[in-house]
Amino acid sequence: MKVKTRSKKVNKAWLDQHVNDPYVQRARKEGYRARAAYKLREIDEQLGLIRPGYTVVDLGATPGAWSQYLRRRMAAEGAIIALDILPMEPLEGVTCLHGDFRAPDVQQRLEQALAGRVVDVVVSDMAPNLSGIACADAARMADLVELAVAFSCRHLKPDGALLVKLFHGSGYSDLAALFKQTFLRVVPLKPKASRDKSSETFLLGRGLKKASPNGLDSRSGTAAEPAPLVPIGTNSMPANGD
């Protein structure tokens, strides 16, 4: 009985916090499907990540807040391809794919949707279902990040960018090292819209150290110079959190 009572209190506290969250309230007012839109918006505003006319791949897109922001940011220009293992309500101007990014056939469908276009930016909000076992959760998260990096190496323009979500803790240093091996510039990020108590953090990599043939062969014209990378606030991340 005590366990159930405590569980109800925890759930009520979370619900109260969620309802009163200024980003949740703002998302409702501005028509975003989730508060996560403001994480991407903050990163974009600080670092100049997204530009009209870009081709962007949104991994782990459901419920669609990042894709919504991308579509609004790019207006009617460019292309957005959204993928998630969970179904997502359609969004005008967004190609939505349903499937597990870890499956080869799903990656093939994603490549078919690109129709030969090279990608300016890949954003990934993918995260595994957490088991509470730190080493297992870290391994699952690492698998998703590594797949996103591998996809980016094949499809990004030489000066393209990859933004991924990950959790600060076990395995973080290895993934940061992978980014430094892959990209010319790497910035760790903790947007203000990310909850203070959460171990959620982001890594942004820009400029492939070894450009893929796809990017070199398919670029149209001269790519714009990438905006300088400036950390949001501080680069220090909380080691623990929800």
Swiss-Prot record:
InterPro entries tied to this protein: RNA_methyltr_RlmE, RNA_MeTrfase_FtsJ_dom, rRNA-MeTfrase_E, SAM-dependent_MTases_sf
This protein's encoding gene: rlmE
Protein's recorded name: Ribosomal RNA large subunit methyltransferase E
Record-annotated membrane-spanning stretches: none
Family: Belongs to the class I-like SAM-binding methyltransferase superfamily. RNA methyltransferase RlmE family.
Superkingdom as given in the UniProt entry: Bacteria
Biased composition (Polar residues): 233-242
EC number(s) per entry: 2.1.1.166
Region listing for Disordered, in residue ranges: 198-242
Species whose genome carries this gene: Verminephrobacter eiseniae (strain EF01-2)
Residues annotated as catalytic: 165
Catalytic activities: uridine(2552) in 23S rRNA + S-adenosyl-L-methionine = 2'-O-methyluridine(2552) in 23S rRNA + S-adenosyl-L-homocysteine + H(+)
